[in-house]
Amino acid sequence: SDSQTIVLLDKDGILPPLPLPSDTAYHIRRPDQTAFAGCCNEFWWTLPYVAKGLWRGRVTYALDTLNACVRPQLLHMLSWLAGTRTGFAVSAGKSGADLPAYLPAGCWERYLSTYADAEPGHVWAAVFAAATLFLDAAHQTAEALALPVNEAEAEGSLRYLYRVRELPADASEIF
């Protein structure tokens, strides 16, 4: 049963006593090295698909990939960062709604800047906002939890993003 269940009415007194409601089941969980590395890997390896979609003029594909594949990893990282600042004793809330209270100053505003309309230039800005925010949050989280960051993975993905953004529409190769 849900840990936040309360009995509203038991006229016949047949329900067993319930423990007091608690949100501990929803608290941010401390990542181990495998979860942390997996989140970073998924973020850095799916972000280039957004760039390719933009270069090909497929803005809906780019936005879908950004929101469905990349954003969840960014939200994981921001949640873990919040966890390091609260002893992993809080919930991020639905879609990260409670994170502003637990993140460093300016971090939530940076996260909001990763949302874009369908204008390709705005999507590019959101891509780079997401990339820099993720990298900053990953470094802070890794430092707090004594976890390694795969710098080569991040650098390679960023180099690719910058390169694809500058490609002419008729390019036949990337590098």
Task: Identify what each model region corresponds to.
Residues 4-35:
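A short, charged helix-loop
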Residues 1:
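Conserved catalytic core of two-metal-ion nucleotidyltransferases
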Residues 26-175:
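Conserved nucleotidyltransferase catalytic core and NTase-mimicking acidic/glycine-rich helix/loop elements
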